[in-house]
Amino acid sequence: MTVSPVALRRKTECKPHPTARYWKKCDVEALFGLPFLELVHQAAEVHRQNFNPREIQLSTLLSIKTGGCPEDCAYCPQSAHHNTNLGKEQMMDVDEIVEKAKIAKSRGASRFCMGAAWRGPKPKDVETVSAIIKAVKGLGMETCGTFGMLEEGMAEDLKEAGLDYYNHNLDTDPDRYNDIIHTRRHEDRMDTLGKVRNAGLKVCCGGIVGMNETRAERAGLIASLANLDPQPESVPINRLVKVEGTPLADAEDLDWTEFVRTIAVARITMPQSYVRLSAGRSNMPEAMQAMCFMAGANSIFYGDKLLTTGNPDEDGDRILMEKLNLYPLQFELEGEVAEVEKASGIKVDY
């Protein structure tokens, strides 16, 4: 199917949140095929229609229970199936987690994300993380949890504890899901996402690119995300971090322009979602990150570690945001410039 750039522009300009819009995989692939600068320009226009392009949401991610996961995800160093020299650790102490959240807030983060290497939590685990969520919410931060597949009633318990977002990624194109993961199905992910929505939680749902997939398969991932109804409030786009001992340790590098295209297509197809630069950012040059922000990314993980892999240091992020005249989402410019600069270390110039 051939779709002209003019027709695509007509579809994306000044459109409301397309809850009734079904994205065919071929239509998404046609977006990927637009001339690079034309695609970035269209995505930037959509972004400006829905967000302040200078605001960046700063989130911090903490692994509260690391390693020993029974799932066999080909990309993950925490899987017990892979020899990555990552030991299994017990759940962190509640006070230690809260202290990490306090530090994150003092450095400008507005959202605190917690991950646990479980296939799914047990009822006693839900009790434990509920206490953690309440404590972090007491600091005035948004909370997000990624704890695996949920049983009936668990999402409601997490919601009652004060959880704002539940992260549950679709990982890759549904058509190649079982090439990457054998211990669960795409349908299992959809089942938990349904439980999360029914409980009234916001959804954080994205995927990983750079796992030897084709462009058509990247389009399939974006289409599967964009066709969630309602669309995810938050969409993390991860660039594979290759870890020795995992099946994807020798994956072919994804060209930087293809990653930027993925960000742009995510922005066009999900205009009101936060699109987050997630894993893999430590290997992205500043110019590449700037292109991603131009293409519609408006959220980053802030801190030197993502679960078990590296992330740009906070000083580097502050410097980059100053260069690009970006500022943290949690503050309004008018009347609160001093607070922005004090908490994040980022000088706001407007």
Swiss-Prot record:
Any one GO BP annotation for this protein: biotin biosynthetic process
EC supergroup of this enzyme: transferase
Binding-site residues, [4Fe-4S] cluster: C69, C73, C76
Cofactors (names): [4Fe-4S] cluster; [2Fe-2S] cluster
Keyword terms: 2Fe-2S, 4Fe-4S, Biotin biosynthesis, Iron, Iron-sulfur, Metal-binding, S-adenosyl-L-methionine, Transferase
Cofactor note: Binds 1 [4Fe-4S] cluster. The cluster is coordinated with 3 cysteines and an exchangeable S-adenosyl-L-methionine.
InterPro entries xrefs: Aldolase_TIM, BATS_dom, Biotin_synth/BioAB, Biotin_synthase, Elp3/MiaA/NifB-like_rSAM, rSAM
GO MF term set: 2 iron, 2 sulfur cluster binding; 4 iron, 4 sulfur cluster binding; biotin synthase activity; iron ion binding
Location of the Radical SAM core domain: 54-278
EC number: 2.8.1.6
Sites where the protein binds [2Fe-2S] cluster: C113, C144, C204, R276
Catalytic activity: (4R,5S)-dethiobiotin + (sulfur carrier)-SH + 2 reduced [2Fe-2S]-[ferredoxin] + 2 S-adenosyl-L-methionine = (sulfur carrier)-H + biotin + 2 5'-deoxyadenosine + 2 L-methionine + 2 oxidized [2Fe-2S]-[ferredoxin]
Gene3D superfamilies tied to this protein: Aldolase class I
Keyword Lipid biosynthesis among record annotations: no
Pathway listed: Cofactor biosynthesis; biotin biosynthesis; biotin from 7,8-diaminononanoate: step 2/2
Keyword RNA-binding (UniProt): no
Function: Catalyzes the conversion of dethiobiotin (DTB) to biotin by the insertion of a sulfur atom into dethiobiotin via a radical-based mechanism.
Homology family: Belongs to the radical SAM superfamily. Biotin synthase family.
Subunit structure comment from the entry: Homodimer.
Protein name: Biotin synthase
